[in-house]
């Protein structure tokens, strides 16, 4: 029964105990009261639901096709990587639901994933989007900050602490999560030959990562940093944590192409001639990764691998406007909160993409370009009461001294009025 406005709360809205019986120990908000015991019960119910994220979906485990369809809504292109990831994630969580064993007692091993592709091609976004769809904790780690135990830097166990934090301290939930380790190519050995000097940020880190990636009971310092002999630690089993490693692997395409050219089996002379450096990663083999500097044991822990192609101009244009959470849509709704319409000329969008290509920053650079472009306008607009529209022109993209046009009422609040060409981006498309 709804409580009338102004009616005094006299009991817990859940268990019915009076405020007097509870000694006044209740929390009241918007006419609803809850006592400590009911609050505790609600907390435990939520915790139980979160600790079984895979069971919380009404339709059970999403199929690989459903996972790819979800990725298509958020990530442009990269069809091969989407399929590989969708199948790998589906198999991983199917394995967990079966308690790692099949009917005849066969134990199914974990298959971690390696993504190879240039900066800004979507590696992190793919992993993050899948984790969100699977409703599991997700953490990102940077391999360049890791060093071998005993040296200045970050212990590999600290990446597990990030996952525990993402699970709000629930270790059992974290044990079903996903960790994305970026810049994994930066911990490659300096050369193929074993060195007599210590490579504390290369081979040493690979060795340290081996156990937690394949599955072990790890002890994590609760405050991060180095482990101390007398400090309490958090125990976490990594057997069911999915590790996705990614990196640009600059120069790997040459290693693949050289191997193919030297091979006398499997490729005709015409096929070899048609294999370009930018497409050679399609033929990536484990031996190429070892040649690059990853140790064989580490490569063996990443049996599933896929490559991401460098994004072209058409891809970047689509990334700006097509995905459900595209950058342009985000800025459009940001301005809409101030009752201002944000409009881009078509050639302005093309100029933004051209700048990202020139800087070689991929999709990641689009946001920083837009942020710099709209910075002054976002500062001015909230103070102008009659602002109706902001128009981003090609000139404002190419010339940092020119700001986008601001329409106040029906007049342009800038001296460089010109004919406008609006592009229909279907901002409100759901």
UniProtKB/Swiss-Prot annotation:
Keyword ATP-binding set for record: yes
CDD domains given in the database record: RecA-like_ClpX
Residues reported in the UniProt entry to bind ATP: 118-125
Gene Ontology BP annotations: cell division; proteolysis involved in protein catabolic process
Superkingdom of origin organism: Bacteria
Chain ranges passing through the membrane: none
Entry binding sites for Zn(2+): 12, 15, 35, 38
Family stated for the protein in its record: Belongs to the ClpX chaperone family.
Quaternary structure and interacting proteins, as annotated: Component of the ClpX-ClpP complex. Forms a hexameric ring that, in the presence of ATP, binds to fourteen ClpP subunits assembled into a disk-like structure with a central cavity, resembling the structure of eukaryotic proteasomes.
Protein name (database record): ATP-dependent Clp protease ATP-binding subunit ClpX
Species for this entry: Borrelia garinii subsp. bavariensis (strain ATCC BAA-2496 / DSM 23469 / PBi) (Borreliella bavariensis)
Gene name per UniProt: clpX
């Amino acid at each position: 029964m709804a409580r009338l406005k102004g009616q005094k709360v006299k009991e817990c809205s859940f268990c019915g105990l009076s405020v007097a019986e509870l000694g006044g120990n209740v929390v009241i908000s918007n006419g609803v009261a809850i006592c400590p015991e009911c609050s505790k019960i609600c907390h435990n119910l939520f915790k139980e639901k979160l600790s079984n994220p895979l069971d919380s979906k009404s339709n059970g485990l999403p199929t690989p096709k459903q996972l790819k369809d979800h990725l298509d809504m958020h990530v442009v292109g990269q069809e091969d990587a989407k399929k590989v990831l969708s199948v790998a994630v589906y198999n991983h969580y199917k394995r967990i639901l079966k308690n790692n064993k099949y009917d005849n007692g066969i134990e199914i091993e974990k298959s971690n994933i390696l993504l190879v592709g240039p900066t800004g091609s979507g590696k992190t976004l793919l992993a993050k989007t899948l984790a969100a769809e699977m409703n599991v904790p997700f953490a990102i780690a940077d391999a360049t900050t890791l060093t071998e135990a005993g040296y200045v830097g970050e212990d590999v166990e600290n990446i597990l602490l990030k996952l525990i934090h993402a699970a709000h301290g629930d270790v059992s939930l974290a044990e079903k999560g996903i960790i994305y380790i970026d810049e994994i190519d930066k911990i490659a050995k300096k050369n193929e030959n074993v060195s007599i000097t210590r490579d504390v940020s290369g081979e040493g880190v690979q060795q340290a990562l081996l156990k937690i990636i394949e599955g072990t009971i790890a002890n994590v310092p609760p405050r991060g940093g180095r482990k101390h002999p007398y400090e309490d630690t958090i125990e976490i089993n990594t057997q069911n944590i999915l590790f996705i490693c990614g990196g640009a692997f600059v120069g790997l395409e040459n290693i693949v192409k050289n191997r193919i050219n030297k091979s006398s089996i499997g490729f005709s002379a015409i096929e070899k001639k048609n294999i370009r450096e930018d497409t050679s990663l399609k033929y990536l083999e484990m031996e190429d990764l070892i040649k690059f500097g990853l140790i064989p044991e580490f490569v063996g822990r990443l049996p599933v691998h896929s490559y991401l192609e460098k994004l072209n101009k058409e891809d970047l244009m689509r990334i700006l406007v097509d995905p459900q959470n595209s950058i342009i849509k985000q800025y459009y709704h940001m301005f809409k909160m101030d009752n201002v319409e944000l409009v881009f000329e078509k050639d302005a969008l093309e100029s933004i993409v051209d700048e990202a290509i020139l800087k070689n920053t991929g999709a990641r650079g689009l946001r920083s370009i837009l942020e710099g472009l709209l910075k002054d306008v976002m500062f001015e607009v909230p103070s102008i009461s009659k602002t109706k529209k902001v128009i981003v022109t090609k000139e404002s993209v190419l010339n940092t001294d020119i700001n986008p046009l601001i329409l106040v009422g029906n007049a342009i609040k800038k001296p460089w009025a010109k004919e406008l060409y609006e592009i229909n981006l279907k901002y409100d498309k759901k």
